[in-house]
């Protein structure tokens, strides 16, 4: 599995996930409209959502755009 890993909206940095990591995720604050920063990466399970945060998980290559 390969996931995107950069904080910008349009991302093309790809990371090959470790064995056992079967999920790509993207998380970001639902409050910031301008200058939104994304946290992207690989995970073994979908990260838990914090208050006022959006978390999206998927399981195909580069799906966390």
Swiss-Prot record:
The UniProt entry's GO CC annotations, sorted and at most eight, read: extracellular region
Q: Does the keyword Disulfide bond apply?
A: yes
Q: Does the keyword Cell membrane apply?
A: no
Tissues where this protein is expressed = Expressed by the venom gland.
**Chief place of localization:** secreted
Disulphide-bridged cysteine pairs: 3-24, 6-11, 17-42, 46-57, 58-63
Q: Where in the cell is it found?
A: Secreted
Which UniProt keywords are present, listed alphabetically? Acetylcholine receptor inhibiting toxin, Disulfide bond, Ion channel impairing toxin, Neurotoxin, Postsynaptic neurotoxin, Secreted, Toxin
An example of a GO molecular function for this protein is: ion channel regulator activity
**SUPFAM superfamilies per the UniProt record, alphabetical:** Snake toxin-like
* Homology family: Belongs to the three-finger toxin family. Ancestral subfamily. Orphan group II sub-subfamily.
**Function text:** Binds with low affinity to muscular (alpha-1-beta-1-delta-epsilon/CHRNA1-CHRNB1-CHRND-CHRNE) and very low affinity to neuronal (alpha-7/CHRNA7) nicotinic acetylcholine receptor (nAChR).
Name of this chain's protein: Weak neurotoxin 6
Upper lineage ranks?
Answer: Eukaryota, Metazoa, Chordata, Craniata, Vertebrata
């Amino acid at each position: 599995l390969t996931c995107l890993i950069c904080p910008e909206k349009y991302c093309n940095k790809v990371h090959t996930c470790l064995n056992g990591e079967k999920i790509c995720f993207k998380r970001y604050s639902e409050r910031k409209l301008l200058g939104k920063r994304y946290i992207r990466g690989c995970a073994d399970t979908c990260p838990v959502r914090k208050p006022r945060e959006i978390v999206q998980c998927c399981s195909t290559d580069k799906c966390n755009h």
